[in-house]
Amino acid sequence: MTDSIKLEIEQLRQTLRYHEYQYHVLDNPQIPDAEYDRLFHRLKTLEQQYPQWFSPDSPTQRVGAKPLSAFAQVQHEMPMLSLDNAFSDEELHAFVKRIQDRLVFSPKLLEFCCEPKLDGLAVSILYVDGKLTQAATRGDGSTGEDITLNIRTVRNIPLQLLMENPPTRLEVRGEVFMSQAGFEVLNEKALARGEKTFANPRNAAAGSLRQLDPRITSQRPLLLNAYSIGVAEGIDLPDTHFERLQWLKSIGIPVNNEIQLCEGTENVLNFYRAIMQKRSTLGYDIDGTVIKVNDIALQEELGFISKAPRWAIAYKFPAQEELTVLNAVEFQVGRTGAITPVAKLQPVFVAGVTVSNATLHNGDEIARLDVAIGDTVIIRRAGDVIPQIIGVLHEKRPANAEKIVFPTECPVCGSVIVRIEGEAVARCTGGLFCAAQRKEALKHFVSRKAMDIDGVGAKLIEQLVDREQIHTPADLFKLDLNTLARLERMGLKSAQNALDSLQKAKKTTLARFIFALGIREVGEATALNLANHFKTLEALKEATLEQLQEVQDVGEVVANRIFVFWREPHNVAVVEDLIAQGIHWETVEVKDVGDNPFKEKTVVLTGTLTQMGRTEAKALLQQLGAKVSGSVSAKTDLVVAGDSAGSKLTKANELGVKVIDENTFLAWSKPYL
C-alpha cells in the first residue's frame, strides 16, 4: 500500500511538472485549469498524509514559507555584469566595428543573437543536481540578496529541471517581470482593497521579489525569461548562445519567444526596428533590444571591459519619459465645451518625436500635480497616447514660478465656465454661440465615422466658421461653388470635389446620423443601439427617459443627455433643416437573430481583423445581442483575437477567458446574418 502511495506521489509530481512546462514555457496547455487544480490538490493531500515522502522540489512547495526578517547576502561566483548601451544606429555600427577590429579572424558578417530587453529585475537561479537551491538579485554585480523563497513562488520557474541526468550545478540568469495584463489585475485588486497601487510593471515586479513574506510574492503574477547561463558544472553546453537558450527551454526554463539570429549589422537593425514597432503588442514592457555575439568561442576571445562584456550591447529605444520646462498653459475649448488645459513646453525629444505640447487634463490634475509655470516637469509619451505631464520636480521650482489660474470665462467667446458637481471637466456654457465649439461640432459631423464627408476637412471648416459662412451642419449643404472656390487653397476643382462629397454624404444610415449630431456621451456603439431599438428618428425624438433606458448600454446619465438634446428647439430646428437638405437613409431592419453564441455575452475585440473593420465587427456583434467592451476583465465572456493581438489577449489568458480567432468569429456569426 505504502509503495503504491509513494509511486502515486512521484507520478503526480512528474505530471504536474510536465503540465507546468507545457503551460508556462511552451504556452501550450494540455489540460484544463480545473484538472491541474485537481491533481495539485491530490498531491498536496497525499504529502500531508505521508510526510515521510516530503520533497522540497515538489510543485506544492512554491508557497507558504514564513516571512523573513531580512534578506541574506549572496556572493556571485561569476559577476553579474551590466551592458553598455547604444542609442543610435551609428553607435551600433561602432560596436560591431570594435568587435571586428579586436578579433584575430573576424568573419565578414558576424552572427548575433538578438532579443527584446525586458524591463524587469535581473536574477540568478542556481540548480544543484537539477533542483532549485538558491536565487539572488543582481545587486551590485558582485553581491546580491537571497530571494530563494520568493523565486520558488514564480509559477513558470521549475523547482526541478526536466531532464534525466541534470548538471551538478547550473546557474540560470534571467529577468523577472510582470506582464501588462497581470499588472492591471494586480492594481485592480489593490484598488478594491483600498491599498496603494504600483506605478508600473517594473516597480511591481521589483517590489514583489523583495517582499520579506513569500506568501505575498506568491500572489503576484511574476514571470521569468532566461537570457544566459552562468556557472555550469557536469554538463557540456552547446557552442552558441542561441542554442544554449533553446537547450534551457527544453529542460523547462522559459526563454523569450522573440529571440532571433541575425547575420550582419543590417539584419540586427531590422530586428531592432521590427521589435520597436511590435512593442505595443507584446503584452510586457521592454526598453530596447539586446545584441550578443552568438559564437561562445568568440565571446571568450572578446572578453570583458570594466563591468560590461565586449561581445554584447543594449540598443535602447528612444526614451518615453523626459524632463523639460513648462513655459505656459493654454486653455482649449472642445466640441462639448470642455475646457482642457494644454501645457506649452520647451521642446524635447521623447519616444522618437519632438514634443512641445502636452495635456494637463483638467483643474483637478493641475492641483494634484501641484504644477506651476516655470516648473521642470516629467513628460511621458507612449505609443499613440497624447503626451502628458506625469510628475513635477518641485525641488527645481524657480523663484519666479507662476501659479496656473483656471479661467472663469471662455477664452474664445467669453461665456461663463461652469463645472457640474460630480464631473472633473469644466465647460463653456456658450454652446454653438461659441466659435470653438461650433468648429469642433462641425468637424465631428463630417468625420469618417459620422457623415464621412471626404472633401470637407478641418482647415476648410475653420475658414468657413471664421468667415461666418456656416453656423450649423445644415449650412454645409447650402454652400455653392463660388463660395468654396474663393477660400484659401481651394480653387474650382477642390470646391467641386467638396460639393460632390457633400452630395454623396446625403445618403447615410440612421446610426451614422445620430452619431454625427454630437450628443454628449453618444458614441458609435450607442448610436447604433439607438437606431436598432427605435428604428426611426421620430421614435427616438419622442422617446421618454424610461424608454431610452431600455436601450442596451444607455443608463440614466446618457438617457438624460439624449432627452435634453431633443427638448432644445435649436437642435430640433437643425435636424429638420438637415432633413430638408436631403439627408436620408434606408429604413432600419433588425433581423431576429434568436439564440446565438454571442447573445447577452460581453465580448472584447483585440488585434487586427483582416476580413472586416473593427467598427463593422463591433456593429455585427451588437446586432447579435452582444455587449462589446473595450477592456478585458473577469466579467468578459469572450475575446475575438485578430493578428498582432497584445495585452488584452495576454490578460484574457491569465483570467481564463475564452478566446477565438477571426475565422471562428465569422463562422459562428454567419448563420444569423
Swiss-Prot record:
Organism in which the protein naturally occurs: Pasteurella multocida (strain Pm70)
Gene: ligA
Residues that span the membrane, as ranges: none
Top-level taxonomic group: Bacteria
Catalytic activity: NAD(+) + (deoxyribonucleotide)n-3'-hydroxyl + 5'-phospho-(deoxyribonucleotide)m = (deoxyribonucleotide)n+m + AMP + beta-nicotinamide D-nucleotide
Keyword Thylakoid: no
Record keywords: DNA damage, DNA repair, DNA replication, Ligase, Magnesium, Manganese, Metal-binding, NAD, Zinc
Record-level Gene Ontology MF annotations: DNA binding; DNA ligase (NAD+) activity; metal ion binding
PANTHER family (alphabetical): CHROMOSOME TRANSMISSION FIDELITY FACTOR 18, DNA LIGASE
Residues that coordinate or bind NAD(+): 33-37, 82-83, 115, 138, 175, 292, 316
Domain BRCT: 593-673
Enzyme Commission numbers on file: 6.5.1.2
Residue sites binding Zn(2+) per the record: 410, 413, 428, 434
Role summary: DNA ligase that catalyzes the formation of phosphodiester linkages between 5'-phosphoryl and 3'-hydroxyl groups in double-stranded DNA using NAD as a coenzyme and as the energy source for the reaction. It is essential for DNA replication and repair of damaged DNA.
Cofactor(s) listed in the protein's UniProt record: Mg(2+); Mn(2+)
Active site residues according to the UniProt entry: 117
Protein's UniProt name: DNA ligase
PROSITE patterns named among the record's database cross-references: BRCT, DNA_LIGASE_N1, DNA_LIGASE_N2
InterPro entries recorded: BRCT_dom (IPR001357), BRCT_dom_sf (IPR036420), DisA/LigA_HHH (IPR041663), DNA_ligase (IPR001679), DNA_ligase_AS (IPR018239), DNA_ligase_CS (IPR033136), DNAligase_adenylation (IPR013839), DNAligase_N (IPR013840)
